[in-house]
Amino acid sequence: MAKVRAAVVGSGFGGLALAIRLQAAGCRTMLFEKRDQAGGRAYVYRDQGFTFDAGPTVITAPDCLRELFTLAGRSMDDYIELLPVNPFYRLFWEDGYRFDYSADQALIERQIEKKSQADVAGYRQFLKYSEEVFREGYEKLAHVPFLNWSSMVSVAPQLIRLKAYRSVYSMVAKHVRDPHLRQLFSFHSLLVGGNPFTTTSIYTLIHCLER
C-alpha cells in the first residue's frame, strides 16, 4: 500500500504543528511557504541593522509546543530554553499612564487600586469569569474536533451561559468602569487578530491562560 502523502500550505505555527503531527502519524508530508522563511506571525523583519519581531509577544501555552516535540520523538529542552518574563509587557497611554501586566496577582490589584479603587472588586469578578471561560472553552473544548453542525450545537448551552454572544470589550466593561482598565483587560484579542469590540467574549480566557 502506498504511503499516505499530505501537503500543508503555510508554515505559521498552525501549519508547522499540523505538518509535524502528520509526519509523526506516518504521512509523507510536504510543507509550502511563500515567504523566505517559516514562522507566520512569528516572522522577523530586518532593515538597516534593526530587527523587528512581527510577533508573538509571549508564549501562552508552552505545553502545546512540548507536545509537538514529543510526537516527533524529540525533547523541546534540547532545542529551546523558555525564560520567564516579568512583567509580560508594559502598556503605555498617550496621557502618560502605564501599567505593568504580569502573573503577579497582588501587583495587578495594587495597580488597579491606585488607578481606580472601586474597580478592584469588579476586576476580581472578571478574573473569575475568565477562569470559568478558560475551563469551559479551553480545557474542555479546545481539543474537540467540531466536524459537523450537530457537534457544534451540542456546546451551544455552555456558550450561551458564558455569554459568548457578547464582545470582549462589552464583558470587561460590565465589570470595570475606568477607561484605561477597560482597554487594558480587553486588548488581548488583538494578539490573535481580533477586534475587542466585535470578538466573542470567549477570548477573555487569554487573561487566565497566559498567567
Question: Where are the regions a protein language model picked out?
Answer:
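Detector for methionine-enriched segments
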Residues: 1, 30, 76, 152-156, ...
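A short, structure-level motif marking secondary-structure boundaries and short turns
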Residues: 2-4, 50-52, 152-155, 211
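N-terminal glycine-rich phosphate/pyrophosphate-binding loop and immediately adjacent elements
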Residues: 3-132
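Residues forming anionic-ligand binding surfaces in small-molecule and nucleic-acid pockets
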Residues: 199-211
